[in-house]
């Protein structure tokens, strides 16, 4: 995830290979942004309902698929 993408409401996926491997691959939504503007920590509401704190570089932005009616 790029720094400019780290904002509330963005859909994210936790990167694989982190020290907290149980979260690798999980998806969620950024709920809050904390800390220094150049290195924020993000509260993420995960798909299982838990809320966890991650550094912005531990996440990938999920590309939303266009919906067709």
Where are these regions (language model features)?
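Basic/aromatic-rich interaction segments and small domains that mediate binding to polyanionic partners
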Residues: 3-68
